[in-house]
C-alpha cells in the first residue's frame, strides 16, 4: 500500500544498508591483507587495538585516578583518632561536602567523555578488527571441538550479510536476520571489538542450553586472541565461578540469570568482594523480541514467604464460588435456549408479516445472546450458536447498542447475571445477584460481600469531628478560665477528639480491607474458573500449578501469578496452596537492559515491533538481507468453522506429507492443542515427537528440533520450541519440497507466526508453510468476529467446508494488529508504573552500593543526622516542648541535651537545630574514638601474635540492646587508620541492614497500593498520576525512616563484650545471643569480641547465599532460649550505664522500646 511512498522517498532501510556496504568492502580489503600474517602476527593485532584504546583515554583515566586518590586521602568530617582518642590529621587536603560533590560531578562528566572517546576509537578500529575475526574464522576451518554436548567441526567464515549484521550490532541497533542466517557468528565480531575496552560485554540468550552451547561453540575464536570467555549459567549464584564468569572479557548467559544476579548484588550482598557483576557496558540480546517484548510484562522477582500469612480464604471460598460458576453455566444455557426460541418466534412473525414484532423479538434474542456471551464466553453451546449464520453479527450489533453513551445501559445487561466476564480485558466482576447468591450459600450477611464507600464514610466522620470541635470552642468560651488554661484545655480535649477520629477511621479502613480481601479472593477464583484453562494457560505437575509461557510454550519455572490469582488456581485444582510471598527485589527486563551504556540485539522478526523498540528502548531496527533468496512457499490460510474440523484437516495434511516422506513441523499455541493432535496421530499410527511445557528440556528439545528436517520426521511443538536451533535438511528432503510448517492457529502477534514460518526455507532452501484457522479460535472470536461474520453470511458456508477469501486473510491481519496495539499499550502502561519503581530503585540501590563499597559514602551518616535533628526540632519547637525534644534525643541518640527553656526560645528553631547538631557530632566523635582506640590495640596485639599468618578481615559484633549486627573490618585498613575502619564498618553494616529491611517493606506497600489504584479511574482520576503521587510519599517516608534508624543504631550501638578473642582455630562464633550481649559506649578499653576466622564462619559467598531465598536453604543456627516470663534478669540503661534487676516480662518491654539492653 505504501510502495509509492517508498518509490518517492526511498526505503529508509535500504538507505541505511547503502551507508554500511562500503564498510563491509573495507573490511574485506583488510581481510585480504591479513591472510599473509603468521598466527602470532595476527594475535598481535589485538594487543595493538588495546594499546590504541588505552592511549585514547589515558588523560581521562589519569584525571579520574587523581580524583579517586584525592577523595581517598581527604580526612573525614568525623576524623580518624589517635592513641589518646583525639582527632588527628591525615596526609590529604580536607574537603567540604560541597567540594566532594563537585569532584563526584567531575568524575561523572569524565566517565561520559570516556564513553564518547572509546566509541569513536572503536569505530575507527572496526574495519580492521572485524577483518581480524573473519581471518581467524578462516584459519579455524576444519578444527574440531565440543559444543553443546556434541563434537563440531568449524566450517564457517562470515558472509558479507553477517558482517553487515555485525556492524549494526556494534552501532547499538537491532539486526533483523532471518532464521539460519548465522546470527550467532555475526555477534562474535562486535563482542570481540567491544571486549577490547576491558570493561566486559555480554551476550544474552533465552535458555541455559543456548548460553552454554554458544560459549563453547564460539569460545575458541575469542581464545585465539587471548580473550577470556565464560558462561554464568555454568555456576550457582554467589559462587566464585559465577563471579569469574562476569570478570571474563566476554560473558554469555540467560536474561533471567543475569537479571537475577543484578537483584542479588543489590539485595543480599554485604561485602564488596561478594559482588558478582561489574557494570553494564555493552550487551547483545539474542532473540531480542522474545526478551524485551514477549517477557516485558513479567518482572523478575526475588520473593520470600510472608510471615503469619494464611491462605484459608481461598480454601473456604472455593466450593461456594464453584457453585456460583455452575449456577452461571445453567443460566447461560438458559439464555442460549431462550435465544433460539425467540429467533424461531421471530421467523413466525416475519411469515405473518408482523415486521415490528419480528424486530422486537430479534432485539430480545440479541439481548439474551449478549448476556450469554457476558456470562460465560467459552460455553460450548454458546460457541456453537455463534457459528451459525447471522448470530455473531447479531451479538455484535447488540453489544454496540449497549456500549453506547459510555456503556450506561450495561448494568441492565448484567443485572440478570451472577457475574460478568470481559474476556478481552481479562476481568470478572460479581453482580448484586451474585453477592446475594454466594451470601445465601455461605449463610452470611450480604453486606460482607459489598465494599463500603470509604470516601463517603470518612467525610461523614470528619464532619462529625468538626462539629464536636466547634462545640468545644463554644463551650470553652463560656467557662471562667485564664487564656492559658483555656488554650491548654482546648488542646488536650481536641487531642482526645483527634484520637477518637483516628480510631473511627481505622475501623472504617479495617472493615473495607477485610471485605476487599474477601471480594478480591472471590473475583480471583472466578477468574480461575472462567478465564484460565488447564493445559492452556497453566499445567498441573507434581501437585503444583505451573505457568506456561504463551510465547514459548515452556513452563516458567519459579514464576507465580500475582495478586492471589495463583492461589486461586491452586484452590481450583485442589492442590496445596503455597504460602503467599512478599517481594524482596524486582526489576522488569525493560528497565534492566535500559541500564546498559550500549545495547543491541538480533532476531529473525523485529520489523513488526520497530515502533516499540524505538519508543521504549531507543533502538532502531535494520533488516539485513538474506545470503540467498527466500524460496519458501507461504500459502494462504485455510479457515474452518470449528476447531474439530481444523484439527482433522491438519492430521490429514500430516498424513499426506508423511506418506511421501516430506518432514513436517506442526506449531501449536498450547499444551492442550499439541496433545489433541498427538493423540489423533497416534490413532493413525504416525510416529512423531511432541515438544511442550510438559517435556521442558532445553537440550533434548534443541536436538529434536534440529532433527525435525529429516526425511519422514513429524514434530509437534508449542510456539517457539527450540528457538535458536537451526533445522537443516538433506538434499533428498530438498527434492521433496523441504520442511513443511503447519500452524494450528494464528497467534495474537504476527511476529510469532513469522517465527514459526521462519523454521522452514533457511539459507535459500525450499519449504512451505500454511496456517489452519477456525472461527472458534480465541483470536477470531474476540477480535475478528464482525467482519468474518459478514463474509460467512454472504458466502453461505456449510459445516465442514473450508473458507478461503481475501477478506478473511485481511480480517486475520486486522485482528492481529488490534491485539498488538493493545498489548503495546499495556506494556507502555506497565512501564509507566514500573518507571516510578525504577526511579526509586535506582536511588536505593545507588545508596546501598555506595555503602557497600565505601564509594561516595563519606558524610552520609552526618547528612542523615542533620535531617533527623531538623525533623525532631520541627516537631517539638512549635509547641515549646523542650522536654519532648530531650526525651527523643536520649531515646534515639543516647545523649542528653543540656538546654534550658530560655536558651531554647532565644536560639530560634534554626539555631536549636545547629546547636543540637554540634552537640550530637561532638558526642559521636568521642564515641567513635572510644571504639576505635581499643579496637586498634586489639588488632596490633593480634598481629604481633600471628605475624605473617595474620588474617585479612575481622568480624565484630555490635548491639544497641535491641538489634544485633556484625561488622566486617579490613585489617590493613584498620591498622592504617588507627582503628577507625571499625566505625566505618559499623556505619556500612547499619546502612545495608536498614535499607534491605525498609526496601522490602516498601515494595510490599507499593504492591498493595498498585492492587487497588485502578479503582481511582471511577472517580475520574488518572490511576498512574495517583500512583506516582502516593508512591512518592511512601518513598519519602521510607528514606526518612532509613535515616532515623541508621543514625539511631550507630549512635547507640557498642561492641559486644566478651572475655576471649575468638580466632580461626576455634571455629565460627555462635549466633548473637542478647542474653549475653552487653553494650559499652564510654569504656576506654572494652574487651573486643573479634572473630578472626578468615570467612566469618560462613564464607564470602555463603553469607550472601544464606540471605538469598533463591538459593537452597541451609540448616538454621540454634539460638539460646529466651528467659522465662518471671525469671529475674539484669538490664542496663544505655543512657546512664546503670544496671538493675527485674522480671523478664517487664525487661522485655523496656528492651523492645529501646534504650535498654540485656546484661544477664
Curated annotation (Swiss-Prot):
Respond yes or no to whether keyword Membrane is given for this record. yes
Report the Pfam families cross-referenced here: P-loop_SecA, SecA_DEAD, SecA_PP_bind, SecA_SW
Biased composition, Basic and acidic residues: where in the chain? Answer: 1104-1115
Q: Which UniProt keywords apply?
A: ATP-binding, Cell inner membrane, Cell membrane, Cytoplasm, Membrane, Nucleotide-binding, Protein transport, Translocase, Translocation, Transport
Q: Which residues of the sequence carry a binding annotation for ATP? A: 162, 180-184, 726
Catalytic activity, EC = 7.4.2.8
**Cellular compartment(s):** Cell inner membrane; Cytoplasm
Kindly give the InterPro entries that the UniProt entry links to this protein.
Helicase_ATP-bd, Helicase_C-like, P-loop_NTPase, SecA, SecA_DEAD, SecA_motor_DEAD, SecA_preprotein_X-link_dom, SecA_SF2_C
Quote the HAMAP family the UniProt record gives: SecA (MF_01382)
Functional summary from the UniProt entry: Part of the Sec protein translocase complex. Interacts with the SecYEG preprotein conducting channel. Has a central role in coupling the hydrolysis of ATP to the transfer of proteins into and across the cell membrane, serving as an ATP-driven molecular motor driving the stepwise translocation of polypeptide chains across the membrane.
Q: What is this protein called?
A: Protein translocase subunit SecA
Provenance organism: Salinibacter ruber (strain DSM 13855 / M31)
Which gene does this sequence derive from? secA
Amino acid at each position: 500500500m505504501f510502495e509509492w511512498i517508498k518509490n518517492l522517498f526511498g526505503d529508509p532501510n535500504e538507505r541505511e544498508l547503502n551507508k554500511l556496504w562500503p564498510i563491509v568492502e573495507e573490511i574485506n580489503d583488510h581481510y585480504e591483507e591479513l591472510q599473509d600474517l603468521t598466527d602470532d602476527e595476527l594475535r598481535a593485532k589485538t594487543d595493538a587495538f588495546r594499546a590504541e584504546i588505552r592511549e585514547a583515554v589515558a588523560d581521562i583515566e589519569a584525571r579520574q585516578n587523581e580524583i579517586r586518590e584525592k577523595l581517598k586521602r581527604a580526612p573525614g568530617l568525623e576524623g580518624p583518632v589517635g592513641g589518646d582518642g583525639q582527632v588527628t590529621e591525615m596526609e590529604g587536603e580536607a574537603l567540604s561536602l560541597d567540594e566532594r560533590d563537585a569532584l563526584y560531578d567531575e568524575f561523572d562528566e569524565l566517565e561520559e567523555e570516556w564513553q564518547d572517546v572509546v566509541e569513536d576509537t572503536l569505530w575507527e578500529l572496526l574495519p580492521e578488527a572485524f577483518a581480524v575475526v573473519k581471518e581467524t574464522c578462516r584459519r579455524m576451518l576444519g578444527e574440531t571441538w565440543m559444543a553443546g554436548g556434541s563434537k563440531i567441526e568449524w566450517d564457517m567464515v562470515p558472509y558479507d550479510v553477517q558482517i553487515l549484521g555485525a556492524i549494526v550490532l556494534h552501532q547499538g541497533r537491532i539486526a533483523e536476520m532471518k532464521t539460519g542466517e548465522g546470527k550467532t557468528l555475526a555477534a562474535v565480531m562486535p563482542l570481540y571489538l567491544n571486549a577490547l575496552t576491558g570493561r566486559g560485554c555480554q551476550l544474552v540468550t533465552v535458555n541455559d542450553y543456548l548460553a552454554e552451547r554458544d560459549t563453547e561453540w564460539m569460545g575458541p575464536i575469542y581464545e585465539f586472541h587471548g580473550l577470556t570467555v565464560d558462561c554464568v549459567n555454568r555456576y550457582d549464584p554467589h559462587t566464585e565461578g559465577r563471579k569469574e564468569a562476569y570478570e571474563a572479557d566476554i560473558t554469555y548467559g540467560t536474561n533471567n540469570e543475569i537479571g537475577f544476579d543484578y537483584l542479588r548484588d543489590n539485595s543480599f550482598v554485604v561485602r564488596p568482594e561478594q559482588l558478582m557483576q561489574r557494570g553494564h557496558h555493552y550487551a547483545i540480546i539474542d532473540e531480542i523480541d522474545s526478551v524485551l517484548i514477549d517477557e516485558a510484562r513479567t518482572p523478575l522477582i526475588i520473593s520470600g514467604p510472608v510471615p503469619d500469612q494464611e491462605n484459608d480464604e481461598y480454601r473456604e471460598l472455593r466450593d461456594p464460588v464453584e457453585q456460583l460458576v455452575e449456577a452461571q453455566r445453567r443460566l447461560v444455557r438458559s439464555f442460549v435456549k431462550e435465544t433460539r426460541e425467540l429467533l424461531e418466534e421471530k421467523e413466525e412473525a416475519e411469515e405473518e408479516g408482523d415486521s415490528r414484532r419480528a424486530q422486537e423479538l430479534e432485539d430480545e434474542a440479541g439481548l439474551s445472546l449478549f448476556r450469554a456471551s457476558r456470562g460465560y464466553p467459552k460455553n460450548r453451546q454458546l460457541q456453537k450458536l455463534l457459528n451459525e449464520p447471522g448470530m455473531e453479527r447479531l451479538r455484535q450489533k447488540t453489544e454496540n447498542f449497549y456500549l453506547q453513551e459510555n456503556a450506561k445501559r450495561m448494568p441492565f445487561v448484567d443485572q440478570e447475571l451472577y457475574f460478568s466476564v470481559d474476556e478481552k480485558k481479562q476481568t470478572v466482576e460479581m453482580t448484586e445477584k451474585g453477592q446475594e447468591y454466594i451470601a445465601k450459600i455461605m449463610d452470611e450477611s450480604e453486606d460482607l460481600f459489598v465494599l463500603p464507600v470509604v470516601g463517603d464514610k470518612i467525610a461523614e466522620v470528619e464532619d462529625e469531628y468538626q462539629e464536636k470541635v466547634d462545640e468545644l470552642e463554644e463551650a470553652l468560651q463560656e467557662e471562667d478560665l485564664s487564656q492559658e488554661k483555656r488554650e491548654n484545655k482546648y488542646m488536650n480535649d481536641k487531642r482526645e477528639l483527634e484520637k477518637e477520629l483516628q480510631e473511627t477511621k481505622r475501623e472504617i479502613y479495617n472493615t473495607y480491607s477485610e471485605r476487599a480481601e474477601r471480594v478480591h479472593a472471590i473475583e480471583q477464583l472466578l477468574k480461575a474458573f472462567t478465564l484460565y484453562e488447564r493445559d492452556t494457560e497453566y499445567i498441573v505437575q507434581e501437585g503444583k500449578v505451573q505457568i506456561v509461557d504463551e510465547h514459548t510454550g515452556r513452563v516458567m519455572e519459579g514464576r507465580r501469578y500475582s495478586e492471589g490469582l495463583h492461589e486461586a488456581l491452586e484452590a481450583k485444582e485442589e492442590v496445596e496452596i503455597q504460602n503467599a510471598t512478599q517481594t524482596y527485589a524486582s526489576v522488569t527486563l525493560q528497565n534492566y537492559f535500559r541500564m546498559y551504556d550500549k545495547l543491541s540485539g538480533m532476531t529473525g522478526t523485529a520489523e513488526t515491533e520497530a515502533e516499540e523498540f524505538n519508543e521504549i528502548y531507543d533502538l532502531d531496527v535494520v533488516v539485513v538481507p538474506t545470503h540467498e533468496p527466500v524460496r519458501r512457499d507461504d500459502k494462504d490460510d485455510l479457515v474452518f468453522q470449528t476447531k474439530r474440523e481444523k484439527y482433522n484437516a491438519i492430521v490429514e495434511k500430516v498424513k499426506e506429507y508423511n506418506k511421501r516422506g516430506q518432514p513436517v513441523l506442526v506449531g501449536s499455541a498450547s499444551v492442550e492443542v499439541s496433545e489433541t493432535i498427538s493423540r489423533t496421530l497416534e490413532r493413525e499410527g504416525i510416529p512423531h515427537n511432541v515438544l511442550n511445557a510438559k517435556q521442558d528440556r532445553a537440550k533434548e528439545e534443541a536436538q529434536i528440533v534440529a532433527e525435525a528436517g529429516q526425511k519422514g520426521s513429524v514434530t509437534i511443538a508449542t510456539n517457539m520450541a527450540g528457538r535458536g536451533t537451526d533445522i537443516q535438511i538433506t538434499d533428498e528432503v530438498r527434492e521433496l519440497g523441504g520442511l513443511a510448517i503447519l500452524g494450528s492457529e494464528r497467534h495474537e502477534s504476527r511476529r510469532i507466526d513469522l517465527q514459526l514460518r521462519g523454521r522452514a526455507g533457511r539459507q535459500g532452501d525450499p519449504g512451505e508453510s500454511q496456517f489452519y484457522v477456525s472461527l472458534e479460535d480465541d483470536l477470531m472470536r474476540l477480535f475478528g468476529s464482525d467482519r468474518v461474520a459478514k463474509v460467512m453470511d454472504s458466502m453461505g458456508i456449510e459445516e465442514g467446508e473450508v473458507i478461503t477469501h481475501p477478506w478473511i486473510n485481511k480480517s486475520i491481519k486486522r485482528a492481529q494488529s488490534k491485539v498488538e496495539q493493545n498489548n503495546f499499550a499495556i506494556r507502555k502502561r506497565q512501564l509507566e508504573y514500573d518507571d516510578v519503581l525504577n526511579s526509586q530503585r535506582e536511588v536505593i540501590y545507588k545508596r546501598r552500593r555506595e555503602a557497600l563499597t565505601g564509594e561516595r559514602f563519606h558524610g552520609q551518616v552526618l547528612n542523615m543526622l542533620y535531617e533527623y535533628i531538623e525533623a525532631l526540632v520541627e516537631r517539638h519547637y512549635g509547641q515549646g516542648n523542650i522536654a519532648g525534644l530531650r526525651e527523643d534525643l536520649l531515646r534515639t541518640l543516647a545523649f542528653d541535651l543540656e538546654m534550658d527553656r530560655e536558651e531554647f526560645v532565644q536560639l530560634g528553631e534554626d539555631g536549636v537545630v545547629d546547636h543540637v547538631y554540634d552537640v550530637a557530632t561532638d558526642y559521636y566523635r568521642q564515641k567513635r574514638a572510644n571504639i576505635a582506640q581499643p579496637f586498634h590495640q586489639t588488632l596490633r596485639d593480634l598481629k604481633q601474635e600471628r605475624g605473617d599468618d595474620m588474617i585479612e578481615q575481622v568480624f565484630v559484633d555490635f548491639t544497641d540492646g535491641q538489634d544485633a549486627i556484625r561488622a566486617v573490618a579490613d585489617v590493613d585498613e584498620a591498622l592504617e587508620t588507627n582503628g577507625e575502619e571499625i566505625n566505618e564498618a559499623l556505619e556500612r553494616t547499619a546502612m545495608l541492614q536498614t535499607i534491605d529491611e525498609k526496601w522490602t517493606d516498601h515494595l510490599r506497600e507499593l504492591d498493595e497500593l498498585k492492587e487497588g489504584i485502578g479503582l481511582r479511574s471511577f472517580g475520574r482520576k488518572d490511576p498512574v498520576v495517583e500512583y506516582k503521587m502516593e508512591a512518592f510519599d511512601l518513598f519519602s517516608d521510607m528514606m526518612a525512616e532509613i535515616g532515623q534508624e541508621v543514625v539511631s543504631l550507630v549512635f547507640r550501638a557498642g561492641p559486644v563484650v566478651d572475655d576471649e578473642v575468638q580466632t580461626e582455630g576455634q571455629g565460627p562464633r555462635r549466633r548473637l545471643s542478647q542474653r549475653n550481649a552487653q553494650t559499652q559506649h564510654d569504656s576506654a578499653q572494652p574487651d573486643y569480641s573479634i572473630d578472626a576466622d578468615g570467612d566469618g564462619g560462613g564464607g564470602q559467598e555463603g553469607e550472601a547465599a544464606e540471605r538469598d531465598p533463591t538459593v537452597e536453604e541451609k540448616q538454621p543456627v540454634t539460638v539460646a532460649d529466651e528467659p522465662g516470663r518471671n525469671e529475674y534478669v539484669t538490664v542496663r540503661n544505655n543512657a546512664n550505664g546503670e544496671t538493675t534487676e527485674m522480671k523478664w516480662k517487664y525487661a522485655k518491654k523496656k528492651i523492645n522500646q529501646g534504650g535498654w539492653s540485656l546484661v544477664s
